[in-house]
Amino acid sequence: MKNTSKFQNVVIATIVGWLVLFVFLPNLMIIATSFLTRDDTDFVKLVFTLDNYSRLLDPLYFDVLLHSLNMALIATIACLVLGYPFAWFLARLPQKVRPLLLFLLIVPFWTNSLIRIYGLKIFLSTKGYLNEFLLWLGVIDTPVRIMFTPGAVIVGLVYILLPFMVMPLYSSIEKLDKPLLEAARDLGASKLQTFIRIIIPLTMPGIIAGCLLVMLPAMGLFYVSDLMGGAKNLLIGNVIKSQFLNIRDWPFGSATSITLTVVMGLMLLIYWRASRLLNKKVELE
């Protein structure tokens, strides 16, 4: 028992040390840097200021933040519209077939997402496979310009993040009480009524979880907008990357990072509150 207790203490200490060293301290440094002043020679000057946060209210950066939220919201809705039917179909398949499709859903995670975006870029380019196929069918006379548009960024985000929507939806749909659906049918409820009044409320935890898993990273995937959207379709992640790597304005980059983290934290808080309300509603019913 003593050896087991010592081993547990070592494991816990290792995990805590890892979190402190690679999560807590770096975030603390970013928070501290966000209140300092930029210096052209040493990157950071130890002079306290709030200008880095006030600059975020500048129309240039504020518009990028709103644009990021808008693009993330559209990508989330698209993932939900595409992911819900797929998750429903997956949950209704025979038990023997599901593992294969789940495996195919997870396989893309084995490949770096940046490589997959490069592949999608080639596929959607003016001389790519999609345009060549449409020209061969006679649907179009000249290649359609898809790349470097907001639509291309949305396609890229959906392509990368769709599995994150499907998995929690599949988990919620799989747990649906079939006798409850049969009872609704016996009582004369139509398929639409059953879907709206029973299925959606019961799968709402999966919907909320999937939306968060898609929307939170969607605002920061700077390489998707870089490769698919170009300079005119920036996300807030592009601003952060540019401030740290190109402009070398670390204080403002830190302030932008903290702001994005706070926005994500508020979304998580909304999810937590919504989950509690849903659980209370289910308990009352």
List each language-model region with its residue ranges:
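Non-cytoplasmic
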Residues: 26-33, 38-39, 115-117, 165-168, ...
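Transmembrane alpha-helices
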Residues: 15-24, 103, 107, 159, ...
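Interhelical loop and adjacent transmembrane-helix boundary motif
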Residues: 2-8, 53-60, 218, 226-273
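C-terminal transmembrane helix and the adjacent membrane-cytosol boundary/short C-terminal tail
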Residues: 2-6, 10, 36, 170-185, ...
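Short membrane-interfacial helix/loop motifs at transmembrane-helix boundaries
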Residues: 24-61, 123, 127-128, 230, ...
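Membrane-interfacial helix termini and adjacent extracytoplasmic/periplasmic loops
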Residues: 41, 50, 117-158, 192, ...
